[in-house]
């Protein structure tokens, strides 16, 4: 009996082994496997086999554990009903062409309505304005300076009176005269001595030669009261001190500035040059004219040389030396403006270009040339 049973067991084992031949081999997962190595499960198609095994296991579990229907708190509608509901909620979209056509039609209609309303408003406003103007013109005293029917004026037009009674009438009233400025009033004097029309014409002809225009004669100024206001010293003018030649020291002669670069500016201890108006500590000239006043006779070395061709040392050692303003040849901007002339500016380079050593000689030659032409 025992041998028989053993044979039956061997036969059963062989049959089971034959069935096991057709089962796929599954590699076991080890902790040493990783994605970086070539022996990973992904390279052996292990993931697919594992998913299939899980699906088969799930099927068997569901078949074993399925005892009744699944109960949940809220039941979802079936797929067919949900699709129908979504289709009902979405409205049908109209074609794009119809939308654009309707928009363009509405815009054209609104534009036409706006233009019509605008034209109507303009027409109404014009009518209202014309009505108001007609009502205003109907009143007699509404526009005092304006007449409804202006008639021809019978009164002859009288010539306009001049502002200055002592001046002769102009033959050409349309031409405007030069304005009476402060500088012109100094030259011309009072209002009674204003020039006549012929003199103004001569002045206009000489305007193109403003640089060397002739100065008005000072013959009429006989006494001090008749002198212009600018020729009299003011109350704040410094007293003029005439220094004799014996008081001039060698230190002062050595302190004479020969170049503008050698100037040292000092507003508390320096002295002012009449020409350049700069306050420096170098030695200036001293006018020996007792009637001179203030700092009018003080000239620095560069200004006296470039403007008048003289030296400060010679002027200090000359007991009869008079400053250019006292001689009437000063060409600084203040003196020229007082005489009715324009300022020359930096004219020394132009004078040297034409062969003259100083500005005074160049202006004198220009004046002689224009007098010969006239």
From Swiss-Prot:
UniProt keyword annotations, A-Z: Apoptosis, Cytoplasm, Isopeptide bond, Nucleus, Phosphoprotein, Transcription, Transcription regulation, Ubl conjugation
Residues covered by region (Mediates transcriptional activity): 250-374
Modified residues (Phosphoserine): 142, 190, 217
Major location category of this protein: nucleus
Short sequence motif named Nuclear localization signal, residue ranges: 160-176
GO BP term, example: apoptotic process
This protein's record includes keyword Amino-acid biosynthesis: no
Domain of life of the source: Eukaryota
Pfam family, one: zf-4CXXC_R1
Region (Disordered): 53-110, 138-208
Entry comment on modification after translation: Phosphorylation at Thr-163 promotes interaction with YWHAE and YWHAZ, dissociation from MYC and sequestration in the cytoplasm.
Record-listed cross-link Glycyl lysine isopeptide (Lys-Gly) (interchain with G-Cter in SUMO2), residues: 208
Compositional bias of kind Acidic residues: 196-207
GO cellular component, one term: cytoplasm
Keyword Cytoplasm attributed: yes
Region Interaction with MYC: start-end pairs: 146-170
Location(s) in or outside the cell: Nucleus; Cytoplasm
Residue numbers bearing the Phosphothreonine modification: 163, 196
Subunit structure: Interacts with MYC (via C-terminus), YWHAE and YWHAZ.
Biological role stated in the UniProt entry: Participates in MYC-mediated cell transformation and apoptosis; induces anchorage-independent growth and clonogenicity in lymphoblastoid cells. Insufficient to induce tumorigenicity when overexpressed but contributes to MYC-mediated tumorigenesis. May play a role as transcriptional regulator.
Name this polypeptide is given: Cell division cycle-associated protein 7
Organism: Bos taurus
Classification lineage: Eukaryota, Metazoa, Chordata, Craniata, Vertebrata
Name of the gene this protein is made from: CDCA7
